[in-house]
Amino acid sequence: MTAILERRESASVWGRFCNWITSTENRLYIGWFGVLMIPTLLTATSVFIIAFIAAPPVDIDGIREPVAGSLLYGNNIISGAIIPTSAAIGLHFYPIWEASSVDEWLYNGGPYELIVLHFLLGVACYMGREWELSFRLGMRPWIAVAYSAPVAAATAVFLIYPIGQGSFSDGMPLGISGTFNFMIVFQAEHNILMHPFHMLGVAGVFGGSLFSAMHGSLVTSSLIRETTESESANAGYKFGQEEETYNIVAAHGYFGRLIFQYASFNNSRSLHFFLAAWPVVGIWFTALGISTMAFNLNGFNFNQSVVDSQGRVINTWADIINRANLGMEVMHERNAHNFPLDLASVELDSIDG
């Protein structure tokens, strides 16, 4: 009898816990994805803050020349970064217990791998949590689908690219200047500006910004008049009021006359689907481009593609970009390589010829 009562009590405790986790009445929805999201994101955030402030220099290139990234080692907010895991570690899973000491783990850039893996798991769970809450509220799943674009981009930069290049040391440093350094090196090694998927991503981001600004300005400008013709339309409203003032018919008419009739939407759902889909699809393509360039399927190469009747090269913008790429590659890992890979791989007989 005692055992039966204990089993019922424990079952009720578990049931209450499940109900609390999945309740949509909580101020912040937790959900089963949140059970994993909360500790992973807290871990990633905590280690990032500590490492950004106090992590010792990291031997990123695996050549016993550590690079300092933390504030206590001479950096500021702009130059500081979490330095990627050493090339000596490569793609090995490198938790603290795999190193002989904490000092060795820090020297080899262990915090970077810890932060990145916990962060990616956390943001993936956040996406799952969005779907879970939508499901419990009877909504459609497109919020999570839209969020999959930045999740895919982060996964491409922090996981797929290092896998393709063979080392976490090729991942993006976690800092402002580190991000720009990663972009410059990526251009030098993969010619990303000439990759069509990157072009689609640029169109998605800048186009999304343009459409967002156009939509916001139209909504705030299309007022349902509550004043007489002799008064300003603004007099009937106050900034930030909750009541809707938007008239989609007026906005449609304005925009149709500004450009042409079929450039505007007269259906609110179609309009907002377009506003969501344009940047999401663009960023999906960018993530796909990063993932293909990770395995060295690079941007278009039009170097020395225009010649005259005598076979002499007529330089184009592509040749200027190629020269800039070589210059950036020379500056990158200057102590690890004598020449850029493009120059080091030239056949000797072609030089002699």
Swiss-Prot record:
Binding site for Fe cation: H215, H272
Annotated site, Stabilizes free radical intermediate, chain positions: H190
Protein name, entry field: Photosystem II protein D1
Keywords: Acetylation, Calcium, Chlorophyll, Chloroplast, Chromophore, Electron transport, Herbicide resistance, Iron, Magnesium, Manganese, Membrane, Metal-binding, Oxidoreductase, Phosphoprotein, Photosynthesis, Photosystem II, Plastid, Thylakoid, Transmembrane, Transmembrane helix, Transport
PROSITE patterns for this protein: REACTION_CENTER
Site (Cleavage): A344, S345
InterPro entries: D1/D2, Photo_II_D1/D2_sf, Photo_RC_L/M, Photo_RC_L/M_CS, PSII_D1
Binding site for chlorophyll a ChlzD1: H118
Swiss-Prot/TrEMBL catalytic activity: 2 a plastoquinone + 4 hnu + 2 H2O = 2 a plastoquinol + O2
Bound cofactor: record note: The D1/D2 heterodimer binds P680, chlorophylls that are the primary electron donor of PSII, and subsequent electron acceptors. It shares a non-heme iron and each subunit binds pheophytin, quinone, additional chlorophylls, carotenoids and lipids. D1 provides most of the ligands for the Mn4-Ca-O5 cluster of the oxygen-evolving complex (OEC). There is also a Cl(-1) ion associated with D1 and D2, which is required for oxygen evolution. The PSII complex binds additional chlorophylls, carotenoids and specific lipids.
Binding site for pheophytin a: Y126
Note: 2 of the reaction center chlorophylls (ChlD1 and ChlD2) are entirely coordinated by water. Herbicides such as atrazine, BNT, diuron or ioxynil bind in the Q(B) binding site and block subsequent electron transfer.
GO molecular function: chlorophyll binding; electron transporter, transferring electrons within the cyclic electron transport pathway of photosynthesis activity; iron ion binding; oxidoreductase activity, acting on diphenols and related substances as donors, oxygen as acceptor; oxygen evolving activity
Binding residues annotated for [CaMn4O5] cluster, in chain numbering: D170, E189, H332, E333, D342, A344
Disulphide-bonded residues: none
Biological process terms in GO annotation: photosynthetic electron transport in photosystem II; response to herbicide
One GO location term (cellular component): chloroplast thylakoid membrane
Post-translational modification summary for this protein: Tyr-161 forms a radical intermediate that is referred to as redox-active TyrZ, YZ or Y-Z.
Site (Tyrosine radical intermediate) location in chain: Y161
Chain positions found as Phosphothreonine: T2
